[in-house]
Swiss-Prot record:
Phylogenetic classification of the source organism: Bacteria, Pseudomonadati, Pseudomonadota, Gammaproteobacteria, Pseudomonadales
Reaction(s) this enzyme catalyzes, per UniProt: caffeine + a ubiquinone + H2O = 1,3,7-trimethylurate + a ubiquinol; ubiquinone-0 + caffeine + H2O = ubiquinol-0 + 1,3,7-trimethylurate; theobromine + a ubiquinone + H2O = 3,7-dimethylurate + a ubiquinol
Record protein name field: Caffeine dehydrogenase subunit beta
Residue stretches making up the FAD-binding PCMH-type domain: 1-178
Positions bound to FAD: 32-36, 111-115
Length: 295
């Protein structure tokens, strides 16, 4: 298959791109890495009048860390998140999770912003971003800048909170304390496939009792699920050998998941409980090692 005919514009600055979006917002497709858009065009599932290619906008490719916040341009490629030291040293959870995302060919072209805008329920990065408490910075010529939380940005399966004339420009990610343990775990049919279930975990402890927890799951619902109930249950719990088994049992009791064509609700709850307990065990192990270094 080949795409239907469309106009093509490749701006070199953000103001230029926003002006084009303002003029053509009713029938435009934004080309970032193209890993989702190009198949849709080729199968004629998407038939835009205009394709706006944002690959030459340098403002969207920058990464910097200031005041305990990592500022990531929406056009930063997956391979940079996985490999560059600024990510590995400040937010290693992202780099670890990125090893499970797709394959090297896709990671070389795919972008963080494009992945988030695609908002696939089984995608890893939306869950990671949710666990980290990141903010999405959206800009338009008319509205200026809007900053959305993950809960505001991810509206449903393949649905995001962008207005038709807006562009996701930056992701702002709070840098966790160096004493916070972290881990990402998932189960997929093959490495690089979409997750059947994934868990992103951040936990901290003082005197070997958990005093901080942020957990988000993917492939459980239409959007990333922030596991507030488990976070609250973890606070005050001791970090020890019994923690993973206790977490697994408690998850089974409180998880509410829907059945779909790929898995029964019971099996998905079992899978999510196992994946979450495994991630918490690894994050807790990192807390122990950090405590040793701190001591």
């Amino acid at each position: 298959m080949k795409p239907t005919a469309f106009d093509y514009i490749r701006p070199t600055s953000l103001p230029e791109a926003l002006a084009i979006l303002a003029e053509h917002s009713d029938d435009v497709a934004i080309l970032a890495g193209g890993q989702s858009l190009m198949p849709l065009l080729n199968f004629r599932m998407s038939r835009p009048a205009l394709v706006l290619d944002i690959n030459d906008i340098s403002e969207l490719q920058q990464v910097r860390c200031e005041n305990d916040t990592l500022y990531v341009g929406s056009m930063v490629r997956h391979c940079r998140v996985e490999q560059e030291e600024i990510f590995r040293s400040t937010i290693p959870l992202m780099s670890e999770a990125m090893t499970s995302v797709a394959h090297i060919q896709i990671k070389t072209r795919g972008t963080l912003g494009g992945n988030l805008c695609n908002a696939h329920p089984a995608s890893e990065m939306p869950a990671v971003i949710t666990a980290l408490g990141a903010s999405m910075v959206c800009k338009s010529e008319k509205r200026g800048e809007r900053v959305l939380t993950p809960e505001e940005f991810f509206e449903g399966a393949l649905q995001n909170g962008l207005q038709s004339d807006e562009l996701l420009c930056e992701i702002r990610i709070p840098v966790p304390s160096q004493y916070v343990g972290w881990a990402f775990e998932e189960v997929a049919r093959r490495h690089g496939d979409f997750a059947q279930c994934g868990a992103a975990v951040l936990i901290g402890a003082e005197d070997r009792k958990i005093d901080y927890a942020r957990i988000a799951l993917c492939s459980i619902g239409e959007t990333p699920i922030r596991f507030h109930a488990l976070e609250q249950w973890l606070i005050g719990r001791p970090v020890g050998n019994d923690l993973p088994a206790d977490v697994k049992l408690h998850c089974r009791e409180i998880l509410d998941v829907a059945e779909d064509s790929t898995m029964t609700a019971e099996n998905r709850a079992k899978l999510a409980s196992a994946v979450t307990s495994r991630a918490i065990a690894r994050a807790a192990d990192r807390i122990v090692h950090l405590d040793v270094k701190r001591g």
